[in-house]
Amino acid sequence: LGDVYKRQRRFSKSIKAVVIAFLILLLLIPMFMIEDMISERGRTQTDAIAEVGQKWSLAQTITGPYINLKYPITQEDNGTKKVTMGNVTLLPDELSIDGQLSTEILRRGIYKVNVYQSELVIKGFFSSEELRKSNVDMDVLQYQRAAICLNLTDMRGLSEQVSITLNDSVYMFEPGMDGRGIESMGVHAIVDLSALKDDRKLPYEMKIKLKGSQSIYFTPLGKTTRVALKANWNTPSFDGNYLPEKREITEKDFSAQWQVLNLNRNYPQVFINYQNASIKDIQNSNFGVNLKMPVEQYQQSMRSTKYAILIILLTFTVIFFTEIMEKTRIHALQYLLVGLALCLFYSFCLLYTSPSPRD
C-alpha cells in the first residue's frame, strides 16, 4: 500500500505540473490582449500627434539659403537648334543659424503633443570661388534672374513674411520653388547677383518665425555651418548625422551648438543640374533635436508586459514547490485566480500610466 500511495503522489504531482503548464499557456491569452491594448493606445497617440501636426505644423527641416542660376543649353536635333535651360546650384561659403525655441503642450483627447514656435536668425555669405572651380562657363549664367531658395518641410509653419538682406538689398520671398529648388517645398526670391561675376562676396541675413512640432532639423549647406539653439525644454534628444559640440541641459531648458564642415559631408558646394544621388546625400546630412516627452508611458507599459510570462512562471513555481514542501494541496482554480490577479495587475498598470484630461 505504501508503494501504491507513493506512485499515486508522484503521478498526481506530474498531473499538477501539466495542469500548471496549461494554465500558464492559458494566461497568455489575456496578456496578449493587454499587449494589443497597449499597442492600440500607442497607435492612437501617434495618430493624435500626426493630427495636431497637420493643424499646427509638422516637424521642420530647414535647408538653405542657396543660389540657383539658370544657363542656356543649345542642342541640335535633325538640324534644328533647341535651347533648354540648365540649373547651377551654389551653396553658401558660410551658414550661421541662431535659433530660439519656445515650446508648449497641446492636447488631443487624453494625449499630449509638444509643439514649438521658433525665431531663427540666418546669416553668412556667398562667393564665386567654387563656381570658378567647376566646369560652368561663368559668362553664360543668368545672374540678373538668379534665385535665392529656402526649403522648409511644412509651409504652414511660417508665421510672417520672409525676406532676405543680400548685399544691402532687401528681397521678399515668393511661395513655391518654381522648379529651382533642391526640394519642391519652400520659398524663393528672384534677385540680381551680378556681383558674383565680379568675384565679390555676397553677405546675407534673414529672420524667420517658424512653427513646428516634435523636432527641428538643419541641413549643413555651408562650407562651414554653425548652429546655436536654445529652448525651454529639458529632455532633448539630439539626432541626425552630427551631435552638438557643446550642450548644456538644466531643469528648465537646454542649449546646444553644432559646427559642421564641408569636409564632413559627401556633396560639393556647386551642383550642375540636379542629380538624385547628390540630393539624397543632402537629405541624409540633416542634424537637429527631437523634443522628447519626459515619459513614454506606453513604451514603459509594453516593456513591463514582456516580463509577465516570467513573473507568472516564477509565481506558479514558488507555489508549486511550497505545496510539495508543506505537503498541502492547492487547487488548480487557486493557481488560475493568482494568474488572473497578475494579469489584472498589468491592466491596472496600463490604466495608471495612461494620461487623464486633468493632467
Regions found by a protein language model. Give the residues of each.
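Conserved small/polar residues in nucleotide/adenosyl-binding loops
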Residues: L1-Q8, Y352-D359
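Hydrophobic alpha-helical transmembrane signal-anchor segments
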Residues: R10-D36
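Membrane-entry segments of alpha-helical transmembrane domains in multi-pass membrane proteins
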Residues: S14-V18, R107-N114, Q300-Y307
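Alpha-helical transmembrane signal-anchor/signal-peptide segments
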Residues: D36-K55
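Soluble non-transmembrane domains of integral membrane proteins
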Residues: D47, Q54, G64, N68, ...
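Transmembrane alpha-helical segments that form the functional core of multipass membrane systems
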Residues: K280-S354, R358
